[in-house]
Amino acid sequence: MKKRDKILQEAKARLVAAFGDKIKDVILFGSRAWGKPHRWSDWDFLVVVRGAYDWQTVRTIRFIMADIDLDFDVFTQTLVVSEMELTNSLRGRQPVFTDAIQNGVYA
């Protein structure tokens, strides 16, 4: 298994272990997903959640991803968005989200 796929699957497994079916998708996007990273490229993740979320949810997700950083010796950047935001808000239409949804690698 590629390192990319291993990290992606592990991230999803840890998030689902913490949040259950509240986690809809974990998507890798950016240079790591599209095969054009350089040595110091970060790992960009979009976590799509079902239902509402708050700052505590975002903090816990980022703590889980920080453990991924340490365990795999990588640097992750993680964005969190809800299904509702993606379909019903201006925030959900931002190019960073639409690009990740359309072109990212799903766990």
Residue ranges and their predicted role:
Residues 1-25, 34-38, 49-107:
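Catalytic core of pol beta-like nucleotidyltransferases
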Residues 42-48:
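Short, aliphatic-rich beta-strand segments
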